[in-house]
């Protein structure tokens, strides 16, 4: 009789432990899904903001380029124009990320790809802002 109780209690303990393990695994997977969704939302918001900034920068750069094209250029202005054209190509390359799709097919995970884009955006946006400020400063100096 005692043996039946021992077996029944041990069976209940084992099933309760298995249920708790299963619940823990489900909660971890739910947490992972929620984290992934929140990362996607954050990246989506960042992408929209970056898209707006890129559009504004492209407009400003095109305006600067047309200003330089319409007048005579010195060697320094010609160099600035070449840099602006390079920056425009780099900004366009952000719209067509072939690099990321190649890396993704090689087995990189999404977080590494996002880090690559962030590094590329920082690498491009830093010089862009510097060039725009230098070009605007030069224009203001020439006007004034």
Curated annotation (Swiss-Prot):
Residues 19-43, 74-123 form a propeptide. It is found in: Secreted. It comes from the Eukaryota. The modification Asparagine amide is found at residue 70. The modification Isoleucine amide is found at residue 143. Residues 1-18 form the signal peptide. It holds the Pfam family Bombinin. Maximin-2 shows antibacterial activity against both Gram-positive and Gram-negative bacteria. It also shows antimicrobial activity against the fungus C.albicans, but not against A.flavus nor P.uticale. It has little hemolytic activity. Maximin-H8 shows antimicrobial activity against bacteria and against the fungus C.albicans. Shows strong hemolytic activity. This is Maximins 2/H8 type 2.
């Amino acid at each position: 009789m005692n043996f039946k109780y021992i077996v029944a209690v041990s069976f209940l303990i084992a099933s309760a432990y298995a249920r708790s393990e299963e619940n823990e695994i489900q909660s971890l997977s739910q947490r992972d899904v929620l984290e992934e969704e929140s990362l996607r939302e954050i990246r989506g918001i960042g992408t929209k903001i970056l898209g707006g900034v890129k559009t504004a920068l492209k407009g400003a750069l095109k305006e600067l380029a047309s200003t330089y094209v319409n007048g005579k250029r010195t060697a320094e202005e010609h160099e600035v124009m070449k840099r602006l054209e390079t920056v425009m190509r780099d900004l366009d390359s952000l719209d067509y990320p072939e690099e990321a799709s190649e890396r993704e097919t090689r087995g990189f995970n999404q977080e590494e790809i996002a880090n690559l884009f962030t590094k590329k955006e920082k690498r491009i946006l830093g010089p862009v802002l510097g060039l725009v400020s230098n070009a605007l400063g030069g224009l203001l100096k020439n006007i004034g």
